[in-house]
Amino acid sequence: MAFPNTSAQQAETNSKSLEEIHTRKQLLAGGIMNLGLSNTNQMPAPQLLGQPSTTTATPDLVSTNSTPPRAAFNPSSSTTLGFFIPQDSYFGNSLIPVLPRLELPATPSTTTPPITPIANANNPK
């Protein structure tokens, strides 16, 4: 026969579970704050290419022990129309490209050649 579970025991079990969850949340939040991470956005404002850079904050966001991404950041940011968002990634993609959408120029209707019917070789008219 199963043990009878009264409402008092159930309430006590629930409160212990909630207390344990609360302490785990505090530990996780404390660990994130100790690592120096916060909820505020620490990324600089995106800068369009072709404009001279006045700050050096963007390359500093790339991890300091990875020189290939930093070496790739400088030429790529100076030769493209978009801009790049540096990030720390375990997967090796330390730069996220952001490319602008470019509108195609409107073509006038006079530039399209007129459609001519093809004469049937068997029935010339």
From Swiss-Prot:
Record GO biological process: DNA repair
Signal sequence residues: none
Positions with biased composition (Polar residues): 1-16
GO cellular component, as recorded: nucleoplasm; SOSS complex
InterPro entries reported in the protein's UniProt record: SOSSC
A matching Pfam family: SOSSC
Domain of life of the source: Eukaryota
Location of the region described as Disordered in the Swiss-Prot/TrEMBL record: 1-20, 38-74, 105-125
Family: Belongs to the SOSS-C family.
Protein name per Swiss-Prot or TrEMBL: SOSS complex subunit C homolog A
